Structures are given as structure tokens and as C-alpha cells.
């Protein structure tokens, strides 16, 4: 009897997780505005990372090529909201550490993937 109750509880928890993760998966009317559209995740950039992802030129290229956009934002240590996909700076800037541990005036001086571009503030992206 214990195992049956445990199995039912685990199954119920799994169902709850699936419901919370994808509540609109079965609702076509919520997906329709996005169907058939291409989205540039982190901007529009080539395999050579030019322009580098999450840079203003990458987002401008997405618009020029007719893509919708999706991006991630992070807070710097001084609570500036910037467009940056990763939690850490390492992959895009070569600097080790968490985005949240650096003030924006330091992050904006870190070139993205060896380019002249830097991680923009979310407010810069919106302009």
C-alpha cells in the first residue's frame, strides 16, 4: 500500500510540474500570434559571432532581416539591467565571474567576443 500511495504522489507531482512548465501548450489561440515567425535568440549573428550576440548591431540585424527577438537580461552589481544571455561573463568577454558581481561601468568596458561591442543596457536596446 505504501508503494501505491508513493506512486500516486509522484505521478501527481510530475503532472503538476508539467502543467506549470507549459500551461499554454494546449491553447492554440495563445500560440497563433507566434506561429510561422522566425525569432532571433540573442540577436541575429553569424557562426563567426559577427556581430556578436546580444550586441546592438545583432539586434539591428534581426530587425533588418525581419526577425522577432528574444533576449535575456541580467542585473549588474549596481542594479543596472543589461542585455546578457549568460549568468557569467566568461564565454562572451573572457572575464571570469558572475554578471551580478560586476558594476555596469566595468562590464561595458569588456568587449564581446573580441569585438568593439559591449553588453548594452536594456534601456539602450529599447531605444
Where are the predicted features?
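Hydrophobic faces of well-ordered beta-strands that scaffold small-molecule active sites
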Residues: 38-41, 69-71
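N-terminal targeting/anchor module and adjacent flexible "hinge" preceding the catalytic domain
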Residues: 28-30
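Metal-dependent phosphodiesterase/phospholipase catalytic core, i.e.
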Residues: 2-26, 35, 42-45, 56, ...
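Catalytic domains of carbohydrate-active enzymes, especially glycoside hydrolases
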Residues: 58-75, 125
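Active-site-proximal flexible loops/turns
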Residues: 48, 77-79, 92-93
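Glycine-rich, proline-tolerant flexible connector loops at the mouths of alpha/beta enzymes
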Residues: 75-87
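Short, solvent-exposed loop/turn segments at secondary-structure boundaries
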Residues: 49-53
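Short, well-ordered coil/turn segments that N-cap beta-strands
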Residues: 33-37, 65-67
Amino acid at each position: 500500500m505504501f508503494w501505491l500511495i508513493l506512486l500516486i504522489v509522484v505521478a501527481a507531482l510530475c503532472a503538476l510540474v508539467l502543467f506549470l512548465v507549459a500551461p499554454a501548450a494546449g491553447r492554440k489561440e495563445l500560440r497563433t500570434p507566434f506561429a510561422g515567425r522566425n525569432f532571433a535568440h540573442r540577436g541575429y549573428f553569424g557562426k563567426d559571432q559577427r556581430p556578436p550576440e546580444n550586441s546592438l548591431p545583432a539586434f539591428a540585424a534581426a530587425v533588418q532581416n525581419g526577425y522577432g527577438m528574444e533576449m535575456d537580461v541580467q542585473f549588474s552589481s549596481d542594479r543596472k539591467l543589461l542585455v546578457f544571455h549568460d549568468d557569467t561573463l566568461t564565454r562572451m568577454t573572457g572575464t571570469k565571474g558572475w554578471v551580478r558581481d560586476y558594476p555596469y561601468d566595468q562590464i561595458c568596458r569588456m568587449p564581446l567576443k573580441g569585438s568593439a561591442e559591449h553588453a548594452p543596457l536594456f534601456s539602450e536596446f529599447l531605444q
